């Protein structure tokens, strides 16, 4: 599935819900499916600066298909709602090539009106998470050239 197809799927899931109480619950449910990150990876180096809660991200370049290497993201947060946001971002970007990630237009955040329903500090956190995810992809893209 392409990044845009995944975004469209998420938009459809949110469109089925009539209010933001249900949408928050959906985000929290996404977070419950996120596997716990290893204690070794939950360190200062992987901590995302700019988030209100503690958020950790790692990435690896999977070259098992040498013709199409993909980035696999792992993330976690100590806050329930933020963990769901981490899960959403991973769902959209993980499993795609570094170029696809760097070039992606992440419109689903606006379409589901997520930023309108979060505090400014949480919104800054989303920006910081996406910046780090793109930085990982950009680093892998430069390695592959």
Located regions from the model:
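N-terminal intrinsically disordered, cationic/polar leader segments
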Residues: 3-54, 61-65, 109-145
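Functionally constrained cores in energy, signaling, and assembly domains
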Residues: 7, 75, 93, 104, ...
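Conserved interaction-surface patches within small, structured recognition/assembly domains
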Residues: 61-80, 90-94
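Primarily the active-site beta-strand->alpha-helix module of PP2C/PPM metal-dependent phosphatases
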Residues: 86
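Glycine-rich phosphate/pyrophosphate-binding loops
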Residues: 95-112
């Amino acid at each position: 599935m392409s990044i845009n197809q995944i975004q469209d799927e998420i938009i459809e899931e949110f469109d089925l819900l009539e209010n933001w109480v249900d949408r928050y619950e959906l985000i929290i449910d996404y977070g419950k499916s996120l596997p716990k990150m290893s204690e070794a990876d939950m360190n200062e180096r992987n901590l995302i600066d700019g988030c209100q809660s503690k958020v950790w991200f790692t990435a690896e370049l999977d070259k098992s298909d040498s013709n199409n290497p993909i980035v696999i993201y792992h993330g976690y947060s100590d806050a329930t709602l933020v963990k769901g946001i981490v899960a959403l971002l991973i769902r959209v970007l993980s499993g795609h090539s570094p170029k696809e990630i760097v070039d992606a237009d992440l419109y689903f955040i606006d379409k589901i009106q997520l930023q309108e329903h979060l505090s400014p500090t949480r919104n800054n956190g989303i920006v910081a998470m996406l910046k780090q995810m793109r930085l990982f992809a950009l680093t892998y893209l430069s390695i592959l050239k």
